[in-house]
Amino acid sequence: MGKLFGTDGVRGVANKELTGELAYKLGRAGGYYLTRDYKGGKKPVVLIGKDTRISGDMLEAGLVAGLTSAGIDVIKLGIIPTPGVSFLTSSLDVQGGVMISASHNPIADNGIKFFNQKGYKLTDEMEDEIENLIFNKLETIPYPTHEKIGVVDSAPEYYHKYVDYLKETVDSDFSGLKIVVDCANGAAYKVAPEVLKKLRADVMVINGSSDGHKINVNCGSTNPEILRQKVIDEKADLGIAHDGDADRVIMVDERGQVVDGDKIMAICALDMMERGVLNKNTLVTTPYSNLALKEIMEEKGGQVVITKNGDRYVLKEMLENGYNLGGEKSGHIIFLDYNNTGDGVLTALQVVNIVKRTGHKLSELAAVLKPWPQRLANIKVKYKQKLKTSELIKQEISKAEQLLGTEGRVFVRASGTEPVIRLMLEGKDEKRLLELEKKLGSIIEEELN
C-alpha cells in the first residue's frame, strides 16, 4: 500500500491529515482514473455519498471541485450508507462512486473511498495508480474548458431506490416482530428504520440523529450496551446495531445477548446450505473469526476459507472462486447475490427473515455457534511499522503458538486505519490466554513505543 490509502480508502483526522486540498486531489486523480477509458457521448458521471460527520460537507466540496475540474459530472446523494453508494453505482448509468466516511472511527476522523462502475471497492493496485497520479502526474490530468467542465446535481431522493431494493431481498414480511434499531447517529438513520417499517415490523429507533455531532459516540455496532438494555426493557424480539456508515451490523437477541458477525455468518451460512443456495457450501472469513465457525461448518458438511483481514480481501476471494457469502467477525458481511460490498442493513434483513421464516428466536439460532474463548487487545503504539522487523516480538509469538499447540492460535497485525497493533489469542484454556495476552501485550507496547 502507498502513502495515502489504507485498508479501507483514505482515512485521517479531518482538516489535519485529510484536508479539503487532499479531497480535491483525490477527486481529480480518482475521477480521472475511473473515467479515463469512458467512451460515451456524454460526460462521465460519478456519485458521491457521505455519512453524518460535520466534516463531510468540506470534503464533499473538495471532491466535487476535483471531479468537475476533470470534466466529470457529479450527483450528490447526501447522507446514505456506504453500501447504498455501491448499489446505486452498479445499478445506474454512472462511471464510479465515492463515499465520504470513516465508518466506526471517532467523530474527528473522516475518510474517502472509491467504487468502480460495478460498485466494487478498488484493489490495492488501482489505489496505487491513483496515488501515483497525485504525487507524480497530477498536472498531466486535462483541465477541460467551456461546456466540458463537469456540473453538479443533487439527488438525495435516490436513497429510496436503495430502500426498495433492500426490501426485495427478503421473502417474508416482519409483522409481529418488535425490533430496536441503533443507527449510531450515522448514515443508516433513514434507510434502516424505513425498510423495516415497509416490511411491517414494529420499529423503535435509538441514536437516530443526523446532526453529525454524535456519530458512533457510545452507540452503534462497537458499543451495543444501550441497545442491549433497550431490547430487554422494551421486551423486543431483537436489536440491530449499525456503525457510522452502515456497512456492518451487530445484533442483539431477545435476552440482550450480543450476536456478533461470526454468529450472524453461522446463522446465514447454515440456512443457505439447508436451502441449497450457498455456493460450493463455502463461507469466506478472516483470521479474526472464531475457530468454532470452521468447526460447525465442517460438521454440517460445509467448509470455511480464510483470507487476509479486511472485507476487500474477503470480496476478492469470493469473486475469484465463485463464493457468495463471506465476512468478518466485526459484522462486515457480504451477500454477493445482492450487493458488491459489506452491507449492514441488508445483512440484518437476512437474519430477521430467517427468524420470521423459521419461527425460531434469535437466541435459538445463535446457539448453533459455541465460540472458543478469545482475547482481543488493541495496543496503542507510535511505530506500528516496526512490527515486521522486531525479532523479540516474533520470538514471543512463536513461543505462544507452541504453548497453545493445536488447541489455539495467535494473530498479531498492525491496523490499516489506526495507530494500534491488534492482538488476538484463541484457545480452549481461557486462563492461559489471559496470561499470554498480558505478556505479549506488554512486549509489543515496550518494543513499538
Curated annotation (Swiss-Prot):
The modification Phosphoserine is found at S103. GO terms for cellular component: cytosol. Signal peptide: none annotated. The keyword Isomerase applies. Binds 1 Mg(2+) ion per subunit. Its cofactor is Mg(2+). Activated by phosphorylation. Its EC number is 5.4.2.10. Gene3D superfamilies: Alpha-D-Glucose-1,6-Bisphosphate, subunit A, domain 3, Alpha-D-phosphohexomutase, C-terminal domain. It catalyses: alpha-D-glucosamine 1-phosphate = D-glucosamine 6-phosphate. GO terms for biological process: carbohydrate metabolic process; peptidoglycan biosynthetic process; UDP-N-acetylglucosamine biosynthetic process. Belongs to the phosphohexose mutase family. HAMAP family: GlmM_B (MF_01554_B). Catalyzes the conversion of glucosamine-6-phosphate to glucosamine-1-phosphate. This is Phosphoglucosamine mutase.
